[in-house]
């Protein structure tokens, strides 16, 4: 299976998926930490992929997603966005709705 197929499978098999640097318990950058904090506040469970230990995903996902940065939040197979968008949605109090409705 090539890396794009792996990415597609990860996205399709997880309702809420976060591509991030590190893990939810040990984020390796401030953007990933802020995104994890917002997601945890929603109370929804989510899967994650550590792009630091998956260099092929780190290299290929930005082109596949047409989104250049990490973290990337995917909900129900759709890219929601990165840290800035997640933070903005969260500050409006709409993150739980965005996560559940997608």
Task: Write out the residue ranges for each language-model feature.
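Local sequence-structure signature of Cys/Sec-based thiol-disulfide redox active-site neighborhoods
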Residues: 8-45
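Acidic beta-strand-to-loop metal/phosphate-binding motif
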Residues: 19, 72-76
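Thiol/disulfide oxidoreductase modules built on the thioredoxin-like
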Residues: 63-69
């Amino acid at each position: 299976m090539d890396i794009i197929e792996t990415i597609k499978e990860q996205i399709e098999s997880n309702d809420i998926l976060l591509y991030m640097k590190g893990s939810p318990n040990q984020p390796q950058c401030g953007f990933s930490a802020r995104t994890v904090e917002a997601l945890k506040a929603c109370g929804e469970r989510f899967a994650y992929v550590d792009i630091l230990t998956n260099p092929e995903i780190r290299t290929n996902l930005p082109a596949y997603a047409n989104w250049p940065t990490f973290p990337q939040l995917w909900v129900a197979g759709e890219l929601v966005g990165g840290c800035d968008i997640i933070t903005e949605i969260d500050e409006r109090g709409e993150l739980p709705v965005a996560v559940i409705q997608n």
